Protein backbone atom coordinates (compact mmCIF):
# COMPACT_ATOMS: atom_id res chain seq x y z
CA UNK A 1 0.00 0.00 0.00
CA UNK A 2 1.47 3.35 -0.94
CA UNK A 3 2.06 6.00 1.67
CA UNK A 4 -0.68 8.12 0.09
CA UNK A 5 -3.27 5.33 0.49
CA UNK A 6 -2.23 4.14 3.94
CA UNK A 7 -5.08 3.91 6.44
CA UNK A 8 -4.86 6.03 9.57
CA UNK A 9 -6.94 3.47 11.51
CA UNK A 10 -6.67 -0.30 10.96
CA UNK A 11 -9.20 -1.87 8.56
CA UNK A 12 -11.86 -4.29 9.83
CA UNK A 13 -13.06 -7.49 8.16
CA UNK A 14 -16.76 -7.24 9.17
CA UNK A 15 -18.68 -4.53 11.01
CA UNK A 16 -19.61 -0.86 10.89
CA UNK A 17 -17.54 2.26 10.34
CA UNK A 18 -18.85 5.64 11.47
CA UNK A 19 -16.91 8.12 9.34
CA UNK A 20 -16.81 11.91 8.97
CA UNK A 21 -17.70 12.55 12.62
CA UNK A 22 -16.84 16.15 13.59
CA UNK A 23 -13.67 16.21 15.72
CA UNK A 24 -14.53 15.95 19.41
CA UNK A 25 -17.90 14.24 18.88
CA UNK A 26 -16.53 10.68 18.76
CA UNK A 27 -16.31 10.28 22.54
CA UNK A 28 -19.81 11.70 23.00
CA UNK A 29 -21.18 9.22 20.45
CA UNK A 30 -19.37 6.30 22.11
CA UNK A 31 -20.85 7.20 25.52
CA UNK A 32 -24.38 8.26 24.60
CA UNK A 33 -25.04 5.36 22.27
CA UNK A 34 -23.35 2.89 24.66
CA UNK A 35 -21.09 1.60 21.92
CA UNK A 36 -18.33 0.86 24.42
CA UNK A 37 -20.52 -1.74 26.15
CA UNK A 38 -20.11 -4.21 23.30
CA UNK A 39 -17.75 -7.15 23.67
CA UNK A 40 -16.54 -6.54 20.10
CA UNK A 41 -13.34 -4.68 19.29
CA UNK A 42 -13.78 -0.95 18.70
CA UNK A 43 -11.10 1.08 16.97
CA UNK A 44 -11.29 4.84 17.30
CA UNK A 45 -9.41 7.64 15.62
CA UNK A 46 -9.60 11.18 16.97
CA UNK A 47 -8.62 14.37 15.16
CA UNK A 48 -7.71 12.58 11.93
CA UNK A 49 -7.01 14.66 8.82
CA UNK A 50 -10.07 15.26 6.67
CA UNK A 51 -10.32 17.14 3.41
CA UNK A 52 -13.95 18.12 4.01
CA UNK A 53 -13.86 18.76 7.78
CA UNK A 54 -10.22 19.66 8.43
CA UNK A 55 -10.25 17.17 11.32
CA UNK A 56 -12.59 14.29 12.00
CA UNK A 57 -13.23 11.40 14.37
CA UNK A 58 -13.73 7.83 13.16
CA UNK A 59 -15.28 4.82 14.93
CA UNK A 60 -14.94 1.21 13.73
CA UNK A 61 -16.99 -1.52 15.42
CA UNK A 62 -16.14 -5.08 14.48
CA UNK A 63 -18.81 -7.74 13.90
CA UNK A 64 -21.65 -5.26 14.46
CA UNK A 65 -23.99 -4.00 11.74
CA UNK A 66 -25.68 -0.74 12.66
CA UNK A 67 -29.22 -0.50 11.29
CA UNK A 68 -30.41 2.55 9.35
CA UNK A 69 -32.44 3.56 12.43
CA UNK A 70 -29.39 3.35 14.70
CA UNK A 71 -27.29 5.22 12.16
CA UNK A 72 -29.81 8.04 11.84
CA UNK A 73 -29.77 8.63 15.60
CA UNK A 74 -26.13 9.64 15.16
CA UNK A 75 -27.28 12.55 12.96
CA UNK A 76 -28.00 14.56 16.13
CA UNK A 77 -24.24 14.90 16.68
CA UNK A 78 -22.76 14.20 13.28
CA UNK A 79 -25.26 15.19 10.58
CA UNK A 80 -22.74 14.79 7.75
CA UNK A 81 -21.36 11.47 8.97
CA UNK A 82 -21.70 8.25 7.03
CA UNK A 83 -22.09 4.75 8.39
CA UNK A 84 -20.41 2.13 6.22
CA UNK A 85 -21.23 -1.56 6.55
CA UNK A 86 -18.14 -3.70 5.95
CA UNK A 87 -17.97 -7.33 4.79
CA UNK A 88 -14.66 -9.00 3.91
CA UNK A 89 -12.85 -5.64 4.20
CA UNK A 90 -15.14 -4.02 1.57
CA UNK A 91 -17.91 -1.44 1.94
CA UNK A 92 -21.16 -3.18 1.00
CA UNK A 93 -23.59 -0.46 2.15
CA UNK A 94 -23.42 3.25 3.00
CA UNK A 95 -25.96 5.03 5.17
CA UNK A 96 -26.21 8.77 4.54
CA UNK A 97 -27.64 10.07 7.80
CA UNK A 98 -31.00 11.77 8.20
CA UNK A 99 -32.48 13.15 11.40
CA UNK A 100 -34.78 10.50 12.88
CA UNK A 101 -38.44 11.28 13.60
CA UNK A 102 -37.95 10.09 17.18
CA UNK A 103 -35.24 8.74 19.44
CA UNK A 104 -35.83 6.37 22.34
CA UNK A 105 -33.78 5.13 25.27
CA UNK A 106 -30.68 7.23 24.61
CA UNK A 107 -31.20 10.43 26.61
CA UNK A 108 -32.80 11.44 29.89
CA UNK A 109 -35.32 14.27 29.85
CA UNK A 110 -33.79 17.44 31.36
CA UNK A 111 -37.14 18.30 33.02
CA UNK A 112 -36.70 17.05 36.60
CA UNK A 113 -40.50 16.90 36.98
CA UNK A 114 -40.91 14.58 33.99
CA UNK A 115 -42.54 11.25 34.81
CA UNK A 116 -39.79 9.46 32.89
CA UNK A 117 -37.50 9.99 35.91
CA UNK A 118 -39.72 8.02 38.30
CA UNK A 119 -41.35 5.40 36.09
CA UNK A 120 -39.76 2.38 34.37
CA UNK A 121 -40.14 3.78 30.85
CA UNK A 122 -37.64 4.44 28.09
CA UNK A 123 -37.16 8.07 27.20
CA UNK A 124 -38.88 9.08 23.97
CA UNK A 125 -38.23 12.30 22.09
CA UNK A 126 -39.79 13.51 18.84
CA UNK A 127 -37.06 15.20 16.77
CA UNK A 128 -37.68 18.29 14.62
CA UNK A 129 -35.44 20.75 12.83
CA UNK A 130 -36.81 24.28 12.57
CA UNK A 131 -34.75 27.01 10.89
CA UNK A 132 -31.56 24.98 11.28
CA UNK A 133 -32.07 24.28 15.00
CA UNK A 134 -32.69 20.70 16.12
CA UNK A 135 -35.28 20.43 18.89
CA UNK A 136 -36.36 17.35 20.80
CA UNK A 137 -39.81 17.15 22.41
CA UNK A 138 -40.33 14.72 25.30
CA UNK A 139 -43.31 12.41 24.81
CA UNK A 140 -44.16 12.42 28.52
CA UNK A 141 -43.85 16.04 29.70
CA UNK A 142 -44.21 17.58 26.20
CA UNK A 143 -41.39 20.06 26.81
CA UNK A 144 -38.97 20.85 23.97
CA UNK A 145 -35.21 21.11 24.27
CA UNK A 146 -32.29 21.69 21.93
CA UNK A 147 -30.22 18.54 21.43
CA UNK A 148 -27.19 20.02 23.21
CA UNK A 149 -29.21 20.50 26.43
CA UNK A 150 -30.63 16.98 26.31
CA UNK A 151 -27.24 15.41 25.69
CA UNK A 152 -25.62 17.38 28.53
CA UNK A 153 -28.00 15.80 31.02
CA UNK A 154 -27.16 12.21 30.21
From Swiss-Prot:
One of its GO terms (biological process) is 'de novo' pyrimidine nucleobase biosynthetic process. Its cofactor is Zn(2+). Zn(2+) binds at residues 109, 114, 138, 141. GO terms for molecular function: metal ion binding. Binds 1 zinc ion per subunit. The keyword Cytoplasm does not apply. It comes from the Bacteria. It holds the Pfam family PyrI. Gene3D superfamilies: Aspartate carbamoyltransferase regulatory subunit, C-terminal domain (2.30.30.20), Aspartate carbamoyltransferase regulatory subunit, N-terminal domain (3.30.70.140). Keywords: Metal-binding, Pyrimidine biosynthesis, Zinc. The keyword NAD does not apply. GO terms for cellular component: aspartate carbamoyltransferase complex. NCBIfam families: ATCase_reg. Contains catalytic and regulatory chains. Involved in allosteric regulation of aspartate carbamoyltransferase. Belongs to the PyrI family. This is Aspartate carbamoyltransferase regulatory chain.
